[in-house]
Amino acid sequence: MSRSQKNDNFIDKTFTILADVLVKLLPTSQNAKKAFSYYREGMAAQAEGEYAQALESYYHALEFEEDVIDRSYIIYNIGLIYASNGEDEQALEYYHQALELNPRLVQALNNIAVIYHKQGMTYQDEQLLQKAAAYWRKAIQLAPGQYLEAQNWLKNMV
């Protein structure tokens, strides 16, 4: 195992232990604790490429999570899984749901733009490319220092 992998494993284990301690110490409801536990399980499964298990954990987390912003991240992660599996329409659906809850979720804006851009290039569809541009503009407006490739693409598009 390389040093980098050892460090990553150490960090993952440290995060897990720290998260367990925080969940036990912080004054949160039982539902919030269950939601967080399922969310962590989902993240771990997703990181290992166990997408079916990750989805199951995320759906359980949604049953218990009451915080709108936290729900948006769970839904966003579900979208990531669908995108990873090439299910762009499903991914778009979840990214849009995440944005309804959290309009400042720039990662969702970017990922929507990426899908529209890919579809626009594949089908030579100017409307899809315009949609991609609109979502990238929103993402760049919220996070000006990020998405440099998108900024360059937008400059060349004009």
Curated annotation (Swiss-Prot):
InterPro entries: PSI_Ycf3_assembly, TPR-like_helical_dom_sf, TPR_rpt, Ycf3/AcsC/BcsC/TPR_MFPF
GO biological process: photosynthesis
Topology within the bilayer: Peripheral membrane protein
Source domain of life: Eukaryota
Signal peptide annotation: none
Pfam families documented for this protein: TPR_11, TPR_8
Localization (cell): Plastid, Chloroplast thylakoid membrane
Keywords: Chloroplast, Membrane, Photosynthesis, Plastid, Repeat, Thylakoid, TPR repeat
Primary location group: plastid
TPR repeats: 35-68, 72-105, 113-146
GO cellular component, one term: chloroplast thylakoid membrane
UniProt similarity note: Belongs to the Ycf3 family.
Role description: Essential for the assembly of the photosystem I (PSI) complex. May act as a chaperone-like factor to guide the assembly of the PSI subunits.
PANTHER family, A to Z: CELLULOSE SYNTHASE OPERON PROTEIN C, TPR-REPEAT-CONTAINING PROTEIN
Protein name: Photosystem I assembly protein Ycf3
Organism of origin: Cyanidioschyzon merolae (strain NIES-3377 / 10D)
Upper classification of the organism: Eukaryota, Rhodophyta, Bangiophyceae, Cyanidiales, Cyanidiaceae
Gene: ycf3
